[in-house]
Amino acid sequence: MNNDLIAKAAIDRRMAEIITPVIEDMGFELVRVRLMSGKSTILQIMADRPDGGIEVDDCAEISQAVSAVLDVEDPILDEYTLEVSSPGIDRPLTRLKDFEMFEGYEAKIETGDMVDGRRRFKGALAGVEDDEVLINIEEGTIGLKFDWLSDAKLVLTDDLIKEMLRQRKAAGALDETNFDEVSTELETDTPSEGDQ
């Protein structure tokens, strides 16, 4: 299977080869890895549980384990910062199973080459058929070969947020007792009877 969406560049693929076994041994899955250079070099790792719901403590554990392996392998020549995070609500879609898991939700998909005169597609995911990602666009449902994709991510919508909150609550990962109470009283400039 093509994993260019998980690790695009050659150095990213090398990082994935090194860190995937570590992450999988811990019970997690690699969603994406990127080595980004600029003023500073950052190795960004996105991981998740197979059923979703990675926590901050999980990210810290992954960071420690991956850091130890990278110290031994030493694949990055420059100093770098290691960032481990969840994929987030508007997560990248990097594996065929992601397109099945989020069927019905809105996504943006880009292809490496032109398909029917365009490279960008936005619409509701309609599942997977063999090695094709199905997406409902204005013109109808189309199939894009997974290997054609250069980028794909969920679009942040109210429905997606509600579903993620529902899943976290169902998994017991959302404790509403720690939320602040929100006051919905409206202040007005009209003086009350006692102010006159």
UniProtKB/Swiss-Prot annotation:
Disulfide bonds: none annotated. Residues 176-196 are annotated as: Disordered. It comes from the Bacteria. One of its GO terms (cellular component) is cytosol. Gene3D superfamilies: Ribosome maturation factor RimP, C-terminal domain, RimP-like superfamily, N-terminal. It holds the Pfam family RimP_N. Coiled coil: none annotated. Keywords: Cytoplasm, Ribosome biogenesis. Required for maturation of 30S ribosomal subunits. This is Ribosome maturation factor RimP. The lineage of its organism: Bacteria, Pseudomonadati, Pseudomonadota, Alphaproteobacteria, Rhodobacterales. The gene is rimP.
